UniProtKB/Swiss-Prot annotation:
UniProt catalytic activity: S-methyl-L-methionine + L-homocysteine = 2 L-methionine + H(+)
EC number: 2.1.1.10
Protein name: Homocysteine S-methyltransferase 1
Binding positions for Zn(2+) per the UniProt entry: 235, 302-303
Complex and partners: Monomer.
Cofactor(s) the protein requires to work: Zn(2+)
Secreted among keywords: no
Keywords (A to Z) from UniProt: Amino-acid biosynthesis, Metal-binding, Methionine biosynthesis, Methyltransferase, S-adenosyl-L-methionine, Transferase, Zinc
Single Gene Ontology MF annotation: zinc ion binding
Hcy-binding domain residues: 3-317
Function: Catalyzes methyl transfer from S-methylmethionine (SMM) to adenosyl-L-homocysteine (AdoMet). SMM degradation (by HMT-1, HMT-2, HMT-3 and HMT-4) and biosynthesis (by MMT1) constitute the SMM cycle in plants, which is probably required to achieve short term control of AdoMet level.
Length: 323
């Protein structure tokens, strides 16, 4: 049994992934109005990155994801750093998550009745579109001159550095098109990565990837890879998730991970976020229970979800009365 299967079994059949990172960094006073997004805090306020990991562990997360989604070597170089400094920051993202997990686990073991699992650390790798920060991560349109080979070249060194930093998992997140999924599968084979990986897509309509390509075609690519342990979706509206899980169940035997956005909608007039309940939707944790029943093995949150969200999800999925 691999580390991921073992964790899911220890969690009672469904493990909890952490939630939104940027929102929580802002809540702690970080300014992330930066092309590097939450990865900017690796440079300026690493202690806050570790604090967010701690908050999610306390909330019951079984998997915490490094703050490297938008951390790329070209992105750091554009900030005036050397290649060596950029690679050090990538390693730091995993180091901070590992330190938080180890410290939290040590404190948990001192308690007479531990109610937590020893969490796994996933090294986050965002899409090429996330690096471009031009909206293409939401459309999947990278332009005619981008090929699978170019995408492999873009991701290769970051994957090598993050994999060498000691994570338990590699998490490719919010992948918006089939070409990038194919490139990542080939890259995992070429680099002989021995760490289990997951590849999660993003969707705006609940039926296809952001690019409009079908889940079925992309899952065929992932199904053929032994390096990909988990498939799923993240950064997607929560109301689509149950249907996506049902569709994935027909197309794959791999474990399924889902960690959608909160479902809040920005009210441009009032300049505030409207809570999900205003839209007539069920609360996030109530939906999470349905996702578990539909067949998801890992459940968490993405944009605008918080430790409170994950605490509620952990309680409802694991049947706990309190943390």
């Amino acid at each position: 049994m691999g580390v991921l299967e073992d964790l899911v079994a220890r969690a009672g059949g469904c493990a909890v992934i952490d939630g939104g990172f940027a929102t929580q960094l802002e809540a702690l006073g970080a300014d992330i109005n930066d092309p590097l997004w939450s990865a900017a805090c690796l440079i300026t306020r690493p202690h806050l990155v570790k604090e967010v990991h701690m908050q999610y562990l306390e909330a019951g997360a079984d998997v915490i994801i490094s703050s490297s989604y938008q951390a790329t070597i070209p992105g750091f170089i554009a900030r005036g750093m050397s290649v060596a400094e950029a690679e050090d920051l990538l390693r730091t993202s995993v180091k901070l998550a590992n330190e938080a997990r180890d410290e939290f686990w040590k404190s948990t073991l001192r308690k007479s009745k531990p109610i937590y699992n020893r969490a796994l650390v996933a090294a986050s790798i965002g899409s090429y579109g996330a690096y471009l920060a031009d909206g293409s991560e939401y459309s999947g349109s990278y332009g005619a001159d981008i090929t699978a080979e170019k995408l492999k070249d873009f991701h290769r060194r970051r994957l090598q550095v993050l994999a060498s930093a000691g994570p338990d998992l590699i998490a490719f997140e919010a992948i918006p098109n089939q070409m990038e999924a194919q490139a990542l599968v080939e890259l995992l084979e070429e680099e002989k990565v021995q760490i289990p990986s997951w590849i999660c897509f993003s969707s705006v309509d609940g039926k296809n990837l952001c690019s409009g390509e079908s889940f079925a075609d992309c899952l065929k690519i992932l199904n053929a890879s032994e390096k990909v342990a988990v498939v799923g979706v993240n950064c997607t509206p929560p109301q689509f998730i149950e249907g996506i899980i049902c569709e994935f169940r027909k197309q794959t035997k791999k474990a399924i991970a889902v960690y959608p956005n909160s479902g809040e909608v920005w009210d441009g007039r009032a300049k505030r976020w409207l809570p999900v309940e205003c839209l007539g939707h069920k609360s996030f944790d109530a939906l999470a229970k349905r996702w578990q029943e539909a067949g998801a093995s890992l459940i968490g949150g993405c944009c605008r979800t918080t430790p409170s969200t994950i605490r509620a999800v952990s309680k409802i999925l694991k049947g706990r009365t309190g943390h």
